[in-house]
């Protein structure tokens, strides 16, 4: 958090036009540490305020709404606590929002960079996935004129949109308040912009259980937004392609229960003698898409060295299969309207191999889903054995992906849980309940930005 406060205080922007708020819901010594850092910068002429809440009403959305009510700026920049915005962030985003032709632009989303992409195989896989999302998916949606979402951090909002009664401001009825707000804004005529050339690096979770928690929240929140906005989205006077793409975007995590269902029905189908080889052979052509997506993203970012991170695609595939059980639970909870608290993703300020997160008090403990993953991994191996004995060898490689994915989740989860067992936890790097964001309120433009490539 102090790292973020330092970065915001050093943004290249006139200090009389810059107001920094640290939105703090923590319940430990984090508040005192952040207040000390804020006082340090106030003594140097920077407006920094710590807004601490005793009750986490509305979680992140509630904290952002409270911050907005006390802000004076025309524009609101939002950064999660683990991000480090570059000094020129505002000079490259504010002028775009102030151009006369961009009066309807509600928000600007920068590309997420990575502070620790090479920390481990897990962070390399996540970096590969995030690069594909921003460089291909976000850029592609913008180029096609489709609706796209605000990612919750490293972005800039126009206050007029946040206070537009047609939009409704920050709402806490989903776990993805950022995605919810950006879709509601675009459905009443506001627009968004994605700037690939403006990069704000953030920390990638180095712990598998923290990554699972993050994915669970994103999966549940996205489906909550789908359930909330799908009827309204379908009634928009937009081209059919844009409406369909919006529904597919909001429902992207529905793939996980479908993956789980596919595994479960495979064994009964094999025992019944079903042979769906040819239909699946044609459908399998779609599997070419994801490798191309990630290859294009790495080629765009790293040129001739694109293949070095793309080589982690098999591990990323295993992760995706292994997440299907946990994320299916998230989808089910969203569809059945089960409320759960906002569980933040702990970050540990580790950047290079050898730096330790395992002794942090905020390491995520082992959760019961690991036993479900163990059972499903065994089920997948049994299904592979049945496929081989029945001569259905074509299905074995696909089923082995499930076994490898669940096995990876179980073994890595158990190993990291043992490394982070309570007796070894002595260091504190972050707050248990600090919201993901720290907003910066801005009152006006400074200079013109560099033109984005897209």
Model feature map: region roles:
Residues 3, 196-210:
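Active-site donor/metal-binding and catalytic loop motifs
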């Amino acid at each position: 958090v102090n790292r973020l406060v330092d970065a915001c205080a050093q943004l290249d922007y006139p200090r009389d036009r810059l107001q920094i708020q640290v939105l703090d819901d923590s319940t430990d010594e984090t508040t005192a540490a952040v207040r000390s850092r804020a006082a340090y910068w106030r003594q140097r002429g920077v407006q920094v305020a710590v807004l601490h809440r005793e009750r986490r009403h509305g979680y992140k959305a509630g904290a952002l709404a409270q911050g907005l009510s006390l802000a004076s700026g025309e524009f609101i920049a939002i950064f999660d606590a683990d991000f480090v915005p570059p000094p020129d962030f505002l000079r490259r985003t504010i002028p775009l929002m102030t151009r006369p032709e961009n009066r309807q632009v509600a928000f600007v989303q920068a590309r997420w960079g990575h502070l620790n992409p090479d920390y481990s195989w897990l962070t390399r896989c996540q970096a590969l996935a995030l690069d594909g999302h921003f460089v291909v998916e976000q850029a592609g949606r913008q180029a096609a004129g489709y609706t796209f979402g605000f990612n919750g951090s490293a972005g800039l909002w126009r206050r007029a949109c946040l206070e537009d009664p047609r939009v409704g401001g920050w709402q806490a009825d989903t776990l993805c308040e950022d995605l919810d707000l950006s879709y509601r804004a675009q459905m009443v005529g506001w627009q968004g912009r994605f700037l690939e050339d403006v990069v704000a690096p953030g920390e990638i979770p180095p712990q598998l259980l923290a990554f699972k928690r993050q994915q669970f929240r994103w999966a549940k929140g996205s489906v909550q937004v789908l359930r909330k906005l799908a009827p309204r989205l379908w009634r928009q006077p937009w081209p059919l392609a844009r409406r369909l793409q919006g529904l597919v975007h909001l429902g992207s995590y529905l793939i996980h229960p479908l993956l789980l269902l596919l595994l479960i029905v495979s064994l009964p189908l094999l025992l019944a003698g079903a042979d769906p080889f040819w239909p699946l052979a044609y459908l399998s052509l779609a599997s070419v898409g994801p490798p191309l997506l990630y290859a294009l993203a790495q080629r765009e970012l790293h040129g001739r060295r694109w293949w070095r991170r793309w080589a982690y695609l098999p591990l990323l595939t295993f992760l995706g299969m292994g997440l299907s059980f946990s994320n299916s639970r998230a989808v089910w909870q969203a569809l059945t309207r089960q409320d759960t608290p906002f569980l933040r993703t702990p970050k540990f300020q580790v950047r290079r191999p050898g730096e330790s997160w395992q002794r942090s008090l905020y390491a995520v403990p082992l959760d019961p889903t690991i036993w479900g993953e163990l059972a499903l991994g065994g089920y997948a191996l049994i299904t592979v054995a049945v496929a081989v004995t029945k001569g259905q060898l074509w299905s074995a490689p696909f089923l082995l992906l499930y076994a490898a994915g669940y096995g990876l989740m179980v073994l890595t989860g158990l190993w990291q849980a043992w490394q982070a067992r309570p007796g070894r936890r002595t260091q504190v790097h972050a707050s248990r309940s600090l919201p993901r964001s720290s907003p910066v309120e801005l009152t006006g433009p400074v200079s013109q930005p560099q033109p984005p490539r897209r």
